Structures are given as structure tokens and as C-alpha cells.
Amino acid sequence: TCGCQMKEVINEYNVVPLPVTMSEQQGRFYLNSDVPIVVNASQEVKHIASGLSTTLLDIAGLKLKPTDELHENVPSIVFDSIPGMEKEAYKLSVTPQLIKITASAPNGFYYGLQTLYQLLPVDVYCKERARNAEWSVPCVEIEDAPTFRYRGAMLDVCRHFASIDYIKKFIDVLAAHKMNTFHWHLTDDQGWRIEIKKYPKLTEIGSQRSETMVDYFYTHYPFKYDGKPHGGFYTQDEIKEVVAYAQSKYITVIPEIELPGHALAAIASYPELSCTPDSTYEVCKLWGVFDQVFCPTDTFFQFMEGVMDEVVELFPSSYIHIGGDECPKYAWEHCSHCQKLIRELGLENDITPNPVDGRKHTKEEKLQSYIVSRVEKYLNSKGRNIIGWDEILEGGLAPNATVMSWRGVEGGMTAAKAGHDAIMTPNPYAYLDHYQEEPEIAPVTIGGYNTLKKTYSYNPVPADADSLVKQHIIGVQANCWAEYMPTEDNRDYQIFPRLIAISETGWTPMKKKNFTSFCNRMVEDFQRLEAMGVKPCLNFFDVNINTRATQEGVLNVELETFYPGAQIYYTTHGEQPSIHANLYNHPFPLDGTYDLKAAAFVNGKQIGKVTHKQLYKNLISGKKYEIMPEPKGMKGDILGENDILGADTVTLGLTNGKRGNNASSTPWVGISPDNNDKVTFIVDFEKATIRKIRFGTLYNAAGGILPVS
């Protein structure tokens, strides 16, 4: 077979995302070329059913035959349309004599078929003929429908370009996991990736950058570059091809055209779109946020309307994403045209907080709201609505806008309370460019630390949300920003398996979600991903090493693997772990300096790589402390201050037995002293005798991180 064979499947009902109800039954349905497919539904559903016939012919060599009549005592597959079900809902019944998918709309039939595929041998996802597979389905009764109507994933192709083949593979995985939206980030400072025939320079100039910065943003100062041109764009024919491909899998493609910030690629192509049109610009070759933004002149609005005219012809989505994030106001503050426009519009700095978000907004923030509202009005005239990142709340929200909440959950909550739809994509959970395993051993990325477990734990609707908020939080999305993903393998590693966790959050009722169950089902889903050509992060099979303090101040070492039923063996003095090493049963106290190595084993065989961590015991290990001024942002707990390990977790970034490193700033405690004055650290040593105090600091001048003197 072509699927991954190194891991043992836990059970036969490994459906991801988990259905609303699933009742396992006795027996199996056996497939052979005598099995007919009966479709009592529309021509579109017949086309869906033909996909099953084609797949089984190509992969299994089975020639299932379509027919219009169901005959008694003949094992059959039936697609049966009934009225009254939700658009994406379906029922799947499997008995020894009958496989029956019931739905009201083609979307439901398609999702029922995806569940059926997941109950078949994993070989059904292969690209070539399977060998030695038993083509049968375990008997089951399933009733299913999604929790949220919007279940999306965003792919950034501006920082690093992605091929059409990769885009299609990405869509395949979304569809297999019942996600229904592909958010395509097509324009940014580092590249313009969509052909606009009215403005050819956007791709002649804007799609190419001369070189790209290397390593992490703050590693080198001055910055270093690779000296290699990077570029690419999608022709309108290619975009039509992708949109049609996605539609065949019941996925809507939403394009993102960034404005008014993240505009350098467009400004490099047409400098007259900026506040300083006589300046010379280039497509950006480093990462970050830049002052060069669109200037709200008649020229800009004519340009954007021309761009949107072509965009709406290419994308039938009811939504167009207009970005709206990270737009510095410096250029507008120093632009005579912008200041004149601000006066003409009567925009002023707020004296009292805005009633919607409780903030005082500047006149320049209100100018951004004017720009967004004007573009929205134009798109509304074309029958489209806009989505924007949560910054579009600042200065006033456009009348019909949907907010995509990325800087935490507050933006989405604010929008929902104001009666606007919101899509939740908070970076502490849903940003797939963040680390998912220890930064020391992982490929360099932007920062953060979102484990599979943490990503899975997210609930888009807070437990105390009122009915208005519940009504307007319409879904969830995973975001994949590609600054540190120069290859498609890098993308796969960052995206998977965490995207699958987001798929379950979007589909499965929160009360049904269970991380242990998810991990059981993920063992086979890793095989599906491999069969589909995906190369995911395999931290799932490794051991995570954590420390946690008890309320009594004892610092315990905790070892965890996501692989269900695996045994963890460890050593404390640098030896390679084996089944003859220490078997981990429960947390143990850190009572010395440990050169800890651990690995997971199943049936006596190691399944992942060895995890290595040095831990240190000293007089303040596990002790609580106070820091003044209070740390903001970086608090030293790599798992996050609201860690899912439990409410009794004590955040002890400075006394957790771990040393910081240069791989990431996340494990460090970051402090901004008032007036560049002193930092006060208070800890109770109790009765200990102190002979020496040592501390370490992170020094990174390029990042504005300075050592303590």
C-alpha cells in the first residue's frame, strides 16, 4: 500500500472531524465490481457519486455500476435525497447489505462521501493502484452537520510563492476534512501575485523581488539577504482553474487584496499610488510592517476599483477580503493631501472613547475607516461584501463588513456585539506559522508556540457569550503566513497536523471535542496525509518535556506524547533512551541538574525522535516571584499564560528550571522599564543561604531587545 505503515491504527472509525453522532455497528459491507450505485437525487449529486466510481476504479480496480433502481438482496450504495436537512448536513448508514448517504443538498452528499472515504482503507487517498487492501467498510450509523458555517484556511503566497499543484493539494486536504473556505492572500509588500490586465506593471514589477532576507528577522544587523530573485504570479486562467477546482470540492475561494497597508509591491509598480509619488520604490525583500501605504487620492480609488472589477469577475465568492491590518499612519500624518482630506471629511481625534470598542481613535485611524468604507461601498455595488482584519474596527467599522479577529478574540467579540459577523482566527491558537515544537529543534519561524494540543483546545464562542455574539460568530480559520516557508515542505511542516485540529473545531460541537479521541483518530489521519503527498510535522510521535510547579513550590518534570497508548522511556544523564531506561508513569521532582532525554515507544519500538532538554535545579526553582514593572507579551512560559495543562498551572518563566536560548524569544521574560529605569525582581528564598546570584539576558539589538546591566 502507499499509506504510512509505520504506525498502528487504533480503531476503524477514525473520522476527522468527529461527527455529531456516530454509532458503531457489527459487521462490514464488502465492495466488489457487482455493487451498483443508485442515485435518487439531482444531476449534481450523480456527478458526486461518479467521483466514488472513478476513485474505486483507479485505486482498487473495482467497476461499480450506476443504476436507477435498487434491487432487494443486492448489496448496493445509495445516494438518497430528502427535503428538510441543512445544506451541509448528511446521514451515513452502513449495513452488510447497504451503504446509504442521505442529504438535502449536494454539499451534504459530498461531505457524506468524505466520511465514507475515511472509513475505507487509507489506500483510497493514494495516487496509484493499491495492493493487498481489503475493500470493505465497517458498519455504522452517522448523523452529522457542521457547528459553524465558515470553516476556512488562509494561505499566504506573497512572502513565498506556491505552485498551482501545491494549491490544489492544499484544497484536497481542506475538502477531505470538510473545510469549506480557502482564503487566498494574493497581495502584500513582498509580492503581487494576481494578474490584473488593466495594470500590467503589478505583475511585471510587483511580482518579483530582487532577493530575500535570510534567517530570523532579528538574527542579523544589518540584515543579510540570499541574493536570489524570488517571484511568480497567477494568470487569470490559472485563477479560474483553481476556483473551479475548489468549487468541485464545495470550497469557496476568497481573494485578499491588501489595503491600505501592506502595499509596497503595488506602490513599486505604480509610485503614484503613494503619498510620495516622486520617490523610488522596490518590492520589499524583508519582513515586517512598513510606512509606505496607499494614499487616498482619486488615482488610488480609480486604481482599486479597476483592480476589484477584475477580481470580482474571477472570484464568485460573496466575500472579498480587503486586508486592513498593520497600516502605519506616518505617511498620512505627513502628507498634505491626506491632511486636507481629513479636514474636508471633518475627521478629528476622539476626545472620549468610541462606544463600539472603548478606544479613542485618531483622525488618521478614521481616515483608514473612510478608505475601507469607500471600497466597501464599491464592492457592495457589485453584489459583494468585505472581510477585513480586526484593525478595520479602528476609527469606525464599515457598515456591512465582516471582521476577521486575529489579534486575540477581542476584535471578533467587539464586532459581534455590534451586530457584525466575525470569523475567529486568534494568533495564540490559529496561527500555523508559530512554533509547534521546541524552537531549539524546529525550523526557524516567526515565533510564538502553538502546540497541536493548544490549537485543538480553542473554542471560537466563549462559554459566557450571549445570543447576539453566538449569532454573529460565524466560523473559524487557520492562517498560514509564509515568511519562513521558502519551500513547500516547509509549508506542510508548519500547517499539518494543526490545520486538522482547526477543522474539528469548525465542524464538531464543542461538547463533543476530546483531545484524546482526536489523537486516536489522528494516527490514521497521518497515513491519509502521507498518501495525499503531505509531509507534516511529526512531533505527534515525540515526547514533550515540561516543568510545572505545585502550589507548594515543588518543580516537577512532566513528559507527554500525543500518541495514544505509547510508553515513554527517559534518562537523566544524557544516555539514549530505550525500553531498558526509566519508564515514565507520573511527574517526578526536579532534584538536580538533568541532561534529560526521552522517547515514545509502542510495542517496544521507538516511534519518534529523541527529545533532549537540559534542566537545572537551584534555590529558587519552582518558586513564585514578582516583577515590577509587570511583564507584557513575553512572560517566559512557552505554553502560554492560559496554559491548557490546567488551572493550577503556575507561570514561572524565570524559575522553571529551563534556560533561555537564542532560537526564540518566547521562553524569555520581556520587560519594558518605566523611563528606562530599574527592574525589580522579588522572590522569597525562605531560609536558604545565598552565596551567588546569576542571571541571563537575551541581547538582540535589531529587535530592540537589550541586556540588563
Model regions and ranges:
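Contiguous, structured surface segment used for ligand recognition
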Residues: 2-148, 490, 505-528, 532
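Short, compositionally stereotyped local motifs that mark structural "simplifiers"
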Residues: 6, 17, 21, 38-40, ...
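Feature activates predominantly on carbohydrate-active enzymes
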Residues: 85-319, 335, 374, 378, ...
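Residues within well-ordered beta-strands of beta-sheet-rich folds
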Residues: 102, 154, 185, 252, ...
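Active-site beta-loop-alpha junctions enriched in small/polar residues
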Residues: 158, 187-191, 258-262, 325-329, ...
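Active-site neighborhood of glycoside hydrolase catalytic domains
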Residues: 266-271, 283-285, 290-399, 406-414
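Flexible, acidic glycine-rich loops studded with aromatic residues
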Residues: 386-401, 405-556
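Aromatic, loop-rich ligand-recognition surfaces of beta-strand-rich domains
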Residues: 659-709
